[in-house]
Design a protein with these regions (language model features):
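C-terminal accessory helical subdomains adjacent to catalytic cores in phosphodiester-
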Residues: 2-17, 23, 37-63, 67, ...
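Long alpha-helical, hydrophobic tracts
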Residues: 22-25, 29-32, 36
Length: 227
C-alpha cells in the first residue's frame, strides 16, 4: 500500500462541530492533502443541505491498508463511540482492495453482490452493541472512479476513452488509477486527481455513480439525525 492510497481506509467520524475539536492526526503531507480534498468534496455537497449553522464535523482516521483497517475496526469503533468522540462511525474502503484472505469477492458475480458480502463480513466483526452506529461503504472500485464522471476536466485527447464506460464500471483488471495512468502516460493522485476534488460539482459524480450516491446520502441521513 503506497502512502497516496492510505487515505482510502479513512473512516468518517461524525461529531458535533461546536463541541469537539478536530481529531485529524499529524500525517504525512501527501496523505493530509488527500484527506482534506476528499473532505472538501463531501462538505461541498453535504453542508448546503443542512440548516444554517448546523454543519456536522467529519474527521478522517488513517489506516495503513484494508487489512490494517479490518484489524483495527473493532478497537477504533469502541474508542470513538464509548467516550463520545463520535456519534457515528462510517467506513469507506476501496472495494477492490479487500484481501481475498478476509473474504473472497471473486465468487460473487455482480458488484452489488460483492458489496453485500463485503459489508456483511465487516459488520460481523463489529460488536453488536455498536452496529446501529456503524455504516460501511465502498468506493467502486476506487475513489478515482468518481473523478471519471468529469471528462471535461481531463485532457481532450483522452476524453473519449473516459466516457466509454460509466465511472463505477471500470473493472478490477484495470481499476481507475491504472486506467488513468495508461491513458495519460503519467498519473499521480496528489497532483492530478486531488486537484479536481475541490472545484467540481459533487452532484455530477453522484448522478453517475450509484454507490457514491449511497455513501453520500447515508452521510446526509446521519447528519440530519444530529440536528
Amino acid at each position: 500500500m503506497t502512502e497516496h492510497r492510505a487515505y482510502r481506509q479513512w473512516r468518517a467520524l461524525f461529531r458535533n462541530h461546536a463541541k469537539l475539536p478536530s481529531l485529524l492526526k499529524e500525517i504525512r503531507s501527501a496523505e493530509r492533502l488527500v484527506a482534506e480534498r476528499c473532505l472538501r468534496f463531501i462538505h461541498n455537497w453535504l453542508d448546503p443541505q443542512l440548516p444554517e449553522g448546523r454543519r456536522v464535523g467529519i474527521t478522517p482516521v488513517k489506516f495503513q491498508g484494508v487489512s490494517n483497517y479490518l484489524d483495527g475496526l473493532q478497537r477504533k469503533i469502541a474508542l470513538y463511540l464509548d467516550d463520545g468522540r463520535a456519534n457515528f462511525v462510517v467506513g469507506l474502503v476501496d472495494l477492490y482492495g479487500i484481501p481475498a484472505s478476509r473474504i473472497d469477492l471473486s465468487q460473487y458475480t455482480t458488484v452489488k453482490d460483492k458489496i453485500i458480502a463485503a459489508r456483511g463480513y465487516m459488520r460481523s466483526i463489529v460488536p453488536k452493541e455498536y452496529r446501529d452506529r456503524f455504516r460501511q461503504h465502498f468506493a467502486v472500485h476506487e475513489v478515482e472512479a468518481w473523478l471519471l464522471a468529469y471528462p471535461e476536466e481531463w485532457p481532450p485527447e483522452v476524453r473519449d476513452q473516459i466516457t466509454r464506460r460509466a465511472p463505477e464500471q471500470i473493472d478490477l483488471t484495470e481499476p481507475p488509477a491504472k486506467f488513468l495512468k495508461r491513458i495519460l502516460g503519467r498519473y499521480k493522485k496528489t497532483t492530478t486527481a486531488m486537484n479536481l476534488f475541490p472545484k467540481v460539482n459533487p452532484q455530477v459524480a453522484i448522478d453517475k455513480c450509484p454507490f457514491l450516491r449511497q455513501f453520500m446520502e447515508d452521510l446526509l441521513l446521519l447528519a440530519k439525525l444530529l440536528q
